[in-house]
Amino acid sequence: KTNELGGLFLTASAMSFKENDKELIEWYKKEVAKQGIDIRFNTEVTDLGTMRGFDEIIVATGSVPRTMPMIPGFEKTMSFTELLKEKKEVGDKVLFFGGGQSSCEAAYDLILQGKHPIIVEYAGDLVAAQATCLANTSFLRDAMEYHKVPTYLHSTITEIHDGGVTVKGQDGKTFEVACDNVINGIGFVPAPVGDKGRHVHRVGDCVAIGNLRTVIWRAWDVCMKI
């Protein structure tokens, strides 16, 4: 539905140290062009019933950021796409609501720019999700510690306001953390279109939130069955 190929991988590869990911996207673009695949840019499908004349349909509509509208001021948060791909301007102190791999990588990218990130994470550790590459998790945790990134574990945000957030710690007490911007790092949720069927298949994040490896494997599996 946009004017370019890549989906959320464009955002994930936008950081300064993701040269290999950028090269992979360019390789895929060249392969698509080489195979003469018909691409309809700026075209969104909201109803699979409009897709006529196809033997098989593969839905790869990805995911959207998880939201928590019950938190006052949540609408003030910035998405990863706005921060990394669209390069929206941020201040010196950038707070990440969530301490997963995406948040830690983006925080490291900001450190390289001379910014001062802050992380608020509900779990007891950073990059706590399972099935994450140990080399990545170890480096990111070490990098956050080395650069003395203020990190609040076992904590959540109860309100977002101009100039900072209200954080609730494990002991139930609240305190204020000053920041210039808040990044929504609480994850993504699948955004499929239509229902699965005998000739309708889903791949990528619209099935379940994964990583580059899982989405490629899922696409391969579906294509081999077709």
What are these regions (language model features)?
Residues 26-29, 48, 161:
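Extended, charged coiled-coil helical stalks used as long, distance-spanning scaffolds
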Residues 45, 156-157:
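A structural signal for short, hydrophobic beta-strand segments that form beta-sheets
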Residues 150, 158, 175-177:
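Residues that recognize and position ribonucleotide moieties
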Residues 159-160, 202:
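Generic beta-strand structural signal
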Residues 163-168:
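Short polybasic amphipathic segments
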